[in-house]
Structure formats: C-alpha cells, structure tokens
Amino acid sequence: QYKSVTYICDKRFLLVLMFVDYAVEPFYYERGVDFYANGQNYAMASLLTIAGPTLLGQPAFDNLLIAFQNGVKEKTPAAIKTLVDAARATQWRQLPEALGPLAQFAAPECLKAIANPGVDTDAALVVLQSLISRMEVMTDGNYRVEHDQSKNLLRYHELLLRFIDHDKDIEFRQTQITSIKFPLKLMEVSQVDSKASPAVQLADIMIGAAIEAANNITGLRSGGL
C-alpha cells in the first residue's frame, strides 16, 4: 500500500571511488584529461574493486585502502608518505593507470588533494544525497525523513537544512539517469531513537533482509531469511 525503496551501498566500492577521485583524478586533470568524461572514474573504481585484490595482491590492496583512509584523516606528511609507500608495495605495474600517479610519481597534485582540509572519506552525506534523489522521484508531494541517530549525519544537519531551504529552480544531473531538482519536496530531516519509532524498526528489518538477499545473489553467503 505504500511506496518504498531499499538502497544498498557498497561502502568498499565507495571508498575505492573516493581513492580514484583524490589519488588518481588530479594527476590526469593536471595533464588535460577529463577523467570524469563517460564515467571513467566509475569504470576504474569498479575495476579496482573487483580486480584490485587479484592484480595488486590482496593484503597489499587492503593496506592501500587503510593507508588512504588514514592519510585523508590525518593529513600529515608521515601519513601521506605511508600512503605512497603502500601504493608502491602493491603490484602496481599490473594497473599503472590507477596506481601510477601515487606509486610511480607521488604526484603532488594528488597528495595536495588528499591533504585538503575539506576532503574526508565519510560516506554518510553521499548515501543520504543518493537516497534523497531517489525519494524525490518517487514522491508526489512533500515528505519528511526520519533517520536513526547518527553522529556522522549530525555533522551535515546545517547543510541539509540549506538544501531544504533552497527555493530557486535548478536541476543538477549527476549521470544520464540520475538528477536532483530544487526546490526539494523534502521538508524535514530528523533523527529519532529507533527504540521509540516503529517505522525505523521496520526499516531496520527491511535493511537486514535486503543485505541478506544481496549477499545471496552475489554468492557471498547462502541460506538466510
């Protein structure tokens, strides 16, 4: 009787996509290449996520992602050097297009992007924006969002309010099939205690079922619900 959408986010893929955005793309931009044209960034992130462990070595690839997260978080010369060393410790010559900017060149433009104070690897806002863009398409009228309590989302509360308050007509098209129009039909975003919200409890059950189904479909797990 009610419209619903279940949104599954592969956080590992999203982390790899961020790696491509900050540790790869600036190298190509500096050389006049539009790395975002035709979804090249998504293609490389997909290739790295699926084939990276095999081509680069599983432990080394895992260490690279850990070093990237730490480098983005700490932004110190030592953390950045550890990231470059981690890239060089992989079998990067198997995929030089992706790892060369760090492993071969320690490209200053990439290191500068990673050290930028405004850059982090928090996926909360990315996930919420994607979900909002989908809900905007599904809903016929105004709506509000109740979210389980999250310290990460609290960081973006003021930004979300600015999204909601934007009253000028404009459309942003992220891909051929994804766009978001302002003003939003979203009226409010609030955090609630899941223990006091049957709706959030039901959403938790749906999320668990969706994850279980996704694991079964991809072969990561069998059986389940």
Predicted segments, located by residue:
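Phosphate-ester processing/binding pockets and catalytic centers
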Residues: Q1-L225
